[in-house]
Structure formats: structure tokens, C-alpha cells
Amino acid sequence: MSTTATVATTPEGIPVIILKEGSSRTYGKEALRINIAAVKAVEEALKSTYGPRGMDKMLVDSLGDITITNDGATILDKMDLQHPAAKLLVQIAKGQDEETADGTKTAVILAGELVKKAEELLYKEIHPTIIVSGFKKAEEQALKTIEEIAQKVSVNDMDILKKVAMTSLNSKAVAGAREYLADIVAKAVTQVAELRGDRWYVDLDNIQIVKKHGGSINDTQIIYGIVVDKEVVHPGMPKRVENAKIALLDASLEVEKPELDAEIRINDPTQMKKFLEEEENLLKEKVDKIAATGANVVICQKGIDEVAQHYLAKKGILAVRRAKKSDLEKLARATGGRVVSNIDELTPQDLGYAALVEERKVGEDKMVFVEGAKNPKAVSILIRGGLERVVDETERALRDALGTVADVIRDGRAVAGGGAVELEIAKRLRKYAPQIGGKEQLAIEAYASALENLVMILIENGGYDPIDLLVKLRSAHENEANKWYGINVFTGQVEDMWKLGVIEPAVVKMNAIKAATEAATLILRIDDLIAAGKKSESKGGESKSEEKKEED
């Protein structure tokens, strides 16, 4: 590695400076070795968290805030990485997390195992281009295998969808409540799913997640409607309204200030009284217009004047102010109402319906529950837990589980977990490799070994002997009928994972394989690492900041 200025010479021997002094350049095998080491280091950080028996990580940021999690995306997000190859891997992993809700750890660990196998091939003097070509062919066969063995799943297969959610939750800190939470997840996702043409569409933004610490995880509940994290604005208003007709307002119930600055000259108290009466009448008219539509609940995004609160209370209307815009949009989907920006245009047809609107105390706070719509296309999950960290980790776990169930509904396919898919792909790759022959055959076989290493990590984290169990798994997969055989990490037995209920979205597996292969091949193609030097220094080595201090 060179850290001095890079100099080239012309045919006449004239030196030409290419890189500034302070720049560094690493090239050839050394650059490849360093990049591979960086990827392996990121993989090592995640390996112990893989699978249902994986460990947690305690992450402390620069402010001293502590996060305890085994969520791959969270760990990578909070790691302060410096090496460009490591950052590249994290970017690809984040892309996996955005594309599908799970599979981040699988993508990173598989990428790490692939570059390890590539490193072994490099020591055998096999060119990186040949390795990349072999990996690409192996990836193609792996994706083809998943498409062939994946099982069809529909939105009505509630039992399978619950098992998908449970599989996702199994590896989280909330695994003790996985059955209860999986039921909530499956109900929430199927409720907001919509059939568009011949495909199912799921927008997870229509599932509101509200967190309140207190109680236990088992107090977490699904609400077929929306929870507004506000309280009723006036003590004289009803706290419970059945058969609610809801006005959703993106307009204030306050006296509007003129756009232009204006002054009103008042010469005697009667004029002041008339002015205040006129303001009051304006607000009363607004309330009367709302009441005339038949509304008995008002959810307002903006403010509600005290006078308007008084008149709303007199008419027995429950009102909430300063609701979030996102809550208003979800309420519209949940209740069938329409958000109105001008009170004068409010009609009975704009009102939403809910069987019950009620203010309830949750922990230390009061919240308004809007539930019991006829066919709500937006629902809420209220998360409870004794500690804020428990609530935060439950939220992360639920978001992953919601995403995996949504992935299965959108794609309509699922596969078994527990290493079954990886073993089946590895078996088929070993049969496919001799058909290619040459040095590429070695790369394809290395890809198969990397997939098997994923299963070995799963077994090791369960506390079992990986060599012994891998032999049993290979033997089981020789029989075509045993394609779903994997490792039960809770018993250490080789079992049919589909029958056991360990089920994952096919699209998550496919995207993890794509992301890992892309990361590994990208790293293998790099043979030159050029890093720019720090900003130039001035005045005999004094930095600009030091120079400025002297001037001050």
C-alpha cells in the first residue's frame, strides 16, 4: 500500500503526479484481501445472532444510549463502520431490508461465507472473473430451485400465515409470546390486504403501531380501527359514543386570522362586546353545520377554540384536536369517511362510521379508540411491555413479522425454514456443477458449501455438533421426498420443517440470495482501492482549524 503521491513518467522521463500526497492506494491481491477481511468482519458481528437460538447484541451509541437487539438491520444501522467494503455490504443489506422485511442477516452472513470460499479459490490461483461467473451460474440455479419447490399460499390460509409470523418471531427477544403475537400479526395483515386485478396488495402503512410501556407483552392487542394518541378536548364532552358518525376535519375550529395585517379601532366597550359576539357566532355556526350533518364525533387535525369546544360539548359531540395527518388518513380508510378541508362543504356522505369511539386510559396517558368499522382497511396494534426497551424490541419484532406475512400474501409462495432450502439448493448445485466443468465447477461447488455453512452456523448457535447433523441432513435430502427436512434447533433433531410449522416467504430467501451474491461478486471485482488524502494542510503543517484558532 502506498500513502505518498503517485507519480507516473512520460516517455521523455518527465514525472507526472497522478494522486495528491496523503492519498493511499492498495491494488491487486492485497486490495482484494483487505476487502474480503472487511466483509468477514461484518459477518462475524452478526453470526452469533442467526437463528432462533441466536444471541443478542448490546449497542451503545456516542451519547450512551443503549439498544439491546438481535435484529440484523438495527445492528448494521447502529454500527459505526469505516471501511468502504464493509459500508458497501451494509448498503446492500439495507436494500434487502427495504425490499423485504426480513433476511438481512441471511444476506450478510451468506455474503461473508461466499467471500471466504472465494478466498480459498484465489489461493488456488483461480481468477476472480471465473469465480464471479461460477457464482452467477450458481445463483441462477438456486433461484430456479426455490421457484420449483415453493408452495402456493393464499390470503385465506390463516394457519400457514400464522406459522410464517411465528417463524419470524422465533428468533426475536419476544419469542416467549410468539403464538399470541403471531395471531395478531396474521389478523392485521389479512385485514388490510386488497385484491387488485389478480394480485394481492398489502400496504403496511395502513397498520398503525402505537407503543405504551406498562403491562406485559401479552397485553398487546389489535384494534379494528385506529388509536388516536390524544384525549377528548373538553371535560363536558361524552367519553364514549356508540354508533359513531365521524367528521374528519383538516380545518381549524378557530376564528381565522386575516392574511393581511389589519387593525380594528374600538372606541367604547359595546363595540368590543359586539366584536367578541361576532367571533362567537362564527364558531357557533361552524359547530351547527357539523351537527347538522349528524356527526357525533369530530377528529380535527388543527386546533379547536375553547368557545367551539363549549358548543360541541353542549351538542354531545366528542371532539379530538391536533390529530396527526397520518392518523386522519388511516381513520378515513378505517371508517370509510372522507377528510374535509372546508367545514362549509361537509356533508353526511363524508362522515365515517365506527361502532364505538371511546377515551381510555392506557398506562399514564389517555387515548381515543375508534373501532368497530364495517370493513376497516386500516387497523392498529397497541404494544404494551414493562420496559421501554421491551416495547421497542417488540415493535421491531412485529414490524419484521408483519413484513414477512405481507411478503407471503403479495408473492403467494412460501418455503420451509430450518436450513431445508439451503440444503436442497446445495444438493442440486453439486449435481449441476460437473455439467459446467472446468474451474467454474469449483466456484459452483464453493457456492454450495457456503449455503451449507449457513446451516452449520444455525446448528452451532443451537448448541449442537454441526458436522454430525450436517451429515444427517445431507443423507435425508438424498431422498426427493425429504426436500423440507431441516434442523429443529430446539431439539437437535432432523425433521420435516413444513410439518413442524417453520415456514418462511419464498421471496425473502430469493432476495437474500440475490443480495449476498451481488455483494460477494462486487467485492471480488475490485482490484484497486484508492482513498483520497485528508484536506491539505497549510503553513508548515498547521491545519486550517489551528490557523483559525491562532487568529481568534
Swiss-Prot record:
InterPro entries: Chaperone_TCP-1, Chaperonin_TCP-1_CS, Cpn60/GroEL/TCP-1, GroEL-like_apical_dom_sf, GROEL-like_equatorial_sf, TCP-1-like_intermed_sf, TCP-1_chaperonin, thermosome_alpha. It comes from the Archaea. GO terms for molecular function: ATP binding; ATP hydrolysis activity; ATP-dependent protein folding chaperone; unfolded protein binding. The N-terminus is blocked. Keywords: ATP-binding, Chaperone, Nucleotide-binding. CDD domains: cpn60. Belongs to the TCP-1 chaperonin family. Molecular chaperone; binds unfolded polypeptides in vitro, and has a weak ATPase activity. Forms a Heterooligomeric complex of two stacked nine-membered rings; one of alpha and the other of beta subunits. This is Thermosome subunit beta.
